[in-house]
Design a protein with these regions (language model features):
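A short acidic, glycine-rich active-site loop
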Residues: 50-62
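Structural beta-alpha unit
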Residues: 1, 72-104, 146
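Short beta->alpha connector loops
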Residues: 12-16, 84-88, 110-112
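Glycine-rich, Arg-bearing micro-motifs that act as flexible, cationic patches
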Residues: 103-125, 138-141
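General small-molecule cofactor/ligand-binding pocket signal
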Residues: 32-34, 79-84, 130-132
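Short, aromatic/basic amphipathic alpha-helical patches
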Residues: 48-51, 66-71, 114-124
Length: 146
């Protein structure tokens, strides 16, 4: 049986970047986390990679592993995707073409989804799109672990 997934975009550069995790419901039994490694949302990952002398893709994997630990209290079916593209909307549509997705959840802070980008997504997306509210208090942006 193919399980329909909830696609959640993550923004490690903002305290609101994991807002999508806070709106998961009991209906979201399978989750796909999408992280873009280029553009404004990856700024803190690039800083971490430089400080640790590792590739930004490795920094992304470390960050996604931390997010998976936070999501795992909700579901065991968690998939992670990191992309090198800076076109967030294009990356969402690419995932939608290859995975059974029932809805898309975006953080309110995600760069690249202002103006035309968000409008294009809302107009053309075949599944519901939810913009998660900004968190009152939540996880801080991705920080370098000491």
């Amino acid at each position: 049986m193919i399980v329909s997934r909830t696609l959640i975009l993550i923004d490690p550069s903002s305290p609101h970047g994991e807002g999508g995790l806070h709106v998961l419901s009991d209906d979201d039994q399978a989750v796909t986390l999408l992280l873009t490694l280029d553009g404004g949302s990856a700024r803190s990952l690039r800083d971490f990679a430089k400080a640790e002398d590792i590739d930004v893709s490795m920094a992304g994997l470390i960050y996604l592993d931390q997010v998976v630990n936070r999501v795992s209290v909700h579901t065991d079916d968690i998939e992670t995707i990191s992309t090198s593209g800076s076109d967030t909307v294009g990356e969402i549509f690419h995932v939608l073409q290859h995975r059974p997705v029932s809805r898309v959840i975006l953080p309110a802070s995600l760069p690249g989804l202002t103006g035309g980008g968000l409008g294009r997504l809302l107009h053309a997306c075949p599944v519901p799109v939810l913009v998660a509210p900004r968190a009152q208090a939540g996880p801080a942006p991705f920080r370098i672990a000491s």
